[in-house]
UniProtKB/Swiss-Prot annotation:
InterPro entries: SQR/QFR_C/D, Succ_DH_cyt_bsu_CS, Succ_DH_cytb556, SuccDH_FuR_B_TM-su
NCBIfam families, A to Z: succ_dehyd_cytB
Organism per entry: Paracoccus denitrificans
Protein name per UniProt: Succinate dehydrogenase cytochrome b556 subunit
Keywords: Cell inner membrane, Cell membrane, Electron transport, Heme, Iron, Membrane, Metal-binding, Transmembrane, Transmembrane helix, Transport, Tricarboxylic acid cycle
Cytoplasmic side: 1-26, 90-109
Gene name for this UniProt entry: sdhC
Length: 130
């Protein structure tokens, strides 16, 4: 059977035209940071297990943790922890019915990103200064 209304149907937005809202991007990032925290947990767990295993195992694990790759993983995990924590707090406000309007969700997304970066930088400063 022929479709007589073929030209009158609405078209989907093209992927190059459609932009995800910032709230959607931060929601996706919350899921990604939750999974990325595993990398830091694995590295710290390996370091702690090596500390009670033998001096040679600890020396190897300690070298990895203190290397530039270990620093990047631990710093990224620390940022992911702050991001995930702040996103969880924002979600509690959503559950209570606050901040659900588009403009409020956009502002809370901006605050989430800025807050996580500021807290991560402050944590690094405290870690290296004190």
């Amino acid at each position: 059977m022929a479709d007589v209304n073929r030209g009158n149907r609405p078209l989907s937005p093209h992927l190059q035209v459609y932009r995800l809202p910032l709230a959607a991007i931060t929601s996706i990032m919350t899921r990604i940071t939750g999974h990325a925290l595993v990398a830091g947990i694995v590295l710290i767990t390996w370091w702690l297990v090596a500390a009670v295993t033998s001096p040679g195992a600890f020396a190897c694990a300690d070298w990895v943790v203190r290397s530039w790759l270990g620093f990047i993983i631990l710093t990224g995990s620390m940022w992911a922890l702050w991001y995930h924590l702040l996103a969880g707090l924002r979600h509690l406000f959503y559950d209570a019915g606050y901040g659900l309007e588009i403009e409020q969700a956009h502002k809370s997304s901006q605050a989430l990103i800025a807050g996580s970066v500021v807290l991560a930088v402050l944590t690094l400063i405290v870690f290296f200064v004190f």
